[in-house]
């Protein structure tokens, strides 16, 4: 009799030896992160202020390599998972650091497969928080580029909300890092039961427009 294949456990756990190294690094290092970046968070309405519970995909603009650390300092009560581009990895040790210390998953920026998207959606479905940068590259000027559809596809397959985030790159180290967290964006409600490329593109465009709105809120906050 053939052995039943054991399904992987993607369920989020409050405590797990799997995440022990990450948790130690996070709680030892977040004080330095708070002091260095000094995040000042603004919310787009009361709904955006609610705690991020259960499965969710965070969609953020991408201004520097430090973005994952900035986001982690913004919402300390959750374990964040990120993606790392395989072309950035030079050796096995780097790969181990990304996977075990930063809880990141490898992805090919030139050809992300549907299999990868399916895995990520299953991981999110287990109650995890995945952060993505849908611009697909770093934009140091803070101007938000068009969004690719990967974040929306993962959120759709996981039936998870997208939490839009905008953060402004500070000009000087003594400035605070300004961050705006938006209302949950429910992809399933936007697209409906039947997924198509056109509907995915429309939803990506709508999410991009909302990100521009968050950028405007951030700029207004800076002027105050």
Residue ranges of model-derived segments:
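Membrane-anchoring hydrophobic helices of lipid-metabolizing enzymes
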Residues: 1-57, 66-70, 77, 102-103, ...
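Non-catalytic C-terminal accessory region of glycerolipid acyltransferases
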Residues: 2-14, 50, 115-224
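Short, glycine/polar-rich helix-capping loops at beta-to-alpha or helix-loop-helix junctions
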Residues: 25, 89-94, 172-174
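Short, flexible loop segments at the rims of nucleotide/cofactor-binding pockets, characterized by
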Residues: 32-38, 58-60, 106-111, 140-142
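Structural signal for hydrophobic
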Residues: 43, 98-99, 162, 181
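Proline- and acidic/polar-enriched loop/turn elements at helix boundaries
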Residues: 46, 87, 109-111, 135, ...
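Catalytic core of membrane glycerolipid acyltransferases/transacylases, capturing the structured
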Residues: 50-111
């Amino acid at each position: 009799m053939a052995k039943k294949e054991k399904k992987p456990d993607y369920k989020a756990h409050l405590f797990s030896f799997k995440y022990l190294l990450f948790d130690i690094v996070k709680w030892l290092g977040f004080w330095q992160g708070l002091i260095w970046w000094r995040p000042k968070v603004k919310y787009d309405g009361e709904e955006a202020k609610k705690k991020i519970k259960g499965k969710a995909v965070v969609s953020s603009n991408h201004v520097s390599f430090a973005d994952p650390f900035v986001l982690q300092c913004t919402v300390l009560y959750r374990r964040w998972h990120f993606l790392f581009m395989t072309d950035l990895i030079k050796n096995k040790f780097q790969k181990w650091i990304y996977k075990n210390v930063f809880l990141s998953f490898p992805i090919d920026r030139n050809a992300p497969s549907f299999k990868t998207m399916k895995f990520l959606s299953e991981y999110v479905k287990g109650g995890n928080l995945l952060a993505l940068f849908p611009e697909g590259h770093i934009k140091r000027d803070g101007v938000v580029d068009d969004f690719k559809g990967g974040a929306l596809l993962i959120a759709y397959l996981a039936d998870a909300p997208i939490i839009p985030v905008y953060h402004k790159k500070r000009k000087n180290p003594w400035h605070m890092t300004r961050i705006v967290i938006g209302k949950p964006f429910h992809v399933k409600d936007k697209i409906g039961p039947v997924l198509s490329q056109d509907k995915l593109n429309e939803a990506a465009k709508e999410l991009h427009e909302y990100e521009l709105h968050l950028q405007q809120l951030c700029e207004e906050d800076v002027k105050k």
